[in-house]
Amino acid sequence: AFMPLLLAPTPAPAFDSTRRISFARLFSISPLGCIGMLLTGGIFSAMFGMASVWGAQSGLSLAQISIFVGAMYVGGLVLQYPIGWASDRTDRRKLIMGLSAVAALVMLVAALAPLPFTVLVGVAMILGGITNPIYSLLIAYTNDFLPREQMAGASAGLIFLNGFGAIFGPTSTGWMM
């Protein structure tokens, strides 16, 4: 994946001076960005880390588990452009909240009702398609409130929060399973 970037004749973009930003300041600027990234890290790690375990416990074959997990990535690939397009034209906060509500509803339906495998694959595509772009939406939303020189520092803080949330996703999901 890095080869095209490394071989491109274009120089890396020049950044003006960057400034650090504390977690307290970052949270005061964008509580949605901070809390969203923490939750997104937990949800991503639970989804992608435990989906195959859930599939095995549910009696899916190895091939079905592979298709199920792969469908989440395909959904992210397919829906990232329409969601990005919508993000550039609507209130990002409302888009993040709306997509999160749809994802929660889809997860709830999937958890409560036994689904045929083909429907399960569709659900996985929808969940992957919605949850993967939320990561980028949260960064973009936070950056909307920052001066350019604080964006890199804020991104570092958001990535840290995402990673911190990722620690608890598979563990808490494993306990619930």
Locations of regions flagged by a protein language model:
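Structural signature of the two symmetry-related core transmembrane helices
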Residues: K94-V109
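Intracellular juxtamembrane helix-capping segments at the cytosolic ends
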Residues: N132-L146
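Residue-level signature of mid-helix packing/kink "hotspots" within the transmembrane helices
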Residues: Y73-Y81, A166-I167
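A late C-terminal transmembrane helix in Major Facilitator Superfamily
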Residues: E149-M177
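Transmembrane alpha-helical segments of major facilitator superfamily
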Residues: I67-G76, L158, N162
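Extracytoplasmic gate region of multi-pass secondary transporters
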Residues: P31-F68
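Helix-to-loop junctions at the C-terminal end of transmembrane segments
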Residues: V78-D91, M177
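C-terminal membrane-cytosol helix-exit motif in multi-pass small-molecule transporters
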Residues: A1-A14
